[in-house]
């Protein structure tokens, strides 16, 4: 959340992962540079709160950097803790500019309802969402509606693909199977595993003589830490975010997430 990402950073707050703004910025770059869409063809469907604002700011920043007009972005709203997406659907239908992709910053039920109500109206639409949506919950909800609603939906992630072979993902799966044999791997628990891994590394480096200030100093001196992500984790006195990388995944016709290259 933006509240926990002050600049300069709060001394006692460290974030492992990329921000929602970084996720949506990566999505816009993918849509423009890989899918060859014009910035004007991208809309945003976002919750009306700080979470939605954070995602929208990433889209606006990326579109500005690509030479587009951030002030003309079609922003589709819905109220937090609801699935009332009718106004957003109407706005999309009335848009004078043909929209080819919607970057979503939602909860999973609202995302599914929005896709359900617009998929047939815009069969070629590209739908993307940030990781907060809950990848498993979104895929399950869409598959209940039918394969055509789920297939092709893109979700950005802040950890590597679950079906990949990075050493950290393999370690995570082994630990999950050992300690929680009834649980299935998912992106939410993998993110927690990664964050805990970083903290444990800092605790070990700090040693037994531990207090808050010493732990903060140890974290701020973590540089190029390799925990098997495929990208290093680094902090500093003015940098309390360890990783800025965003990974791409896409739901296939069986409701499973497949990795995609965002660049």
Q: What is each residue range found by the language model?
A:
Residues 7-10, 18, 115-192, 247, ...:
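Extracellular/periplasmic periplasmic-binding protein-like sensory domains
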Residues 23-28, 77-93, 111:
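Structural motif
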Residues 10-18, 46-49, 75-78, 99-100, ...:
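Second-shell loop/turn segments in exported
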Residues 41-46, 97-108, 114, 125-131, ...:
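Periplasmic-binding protein-like
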Residues 176-190, 200-256:
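Segments of small-molecule ligand-sensing domains
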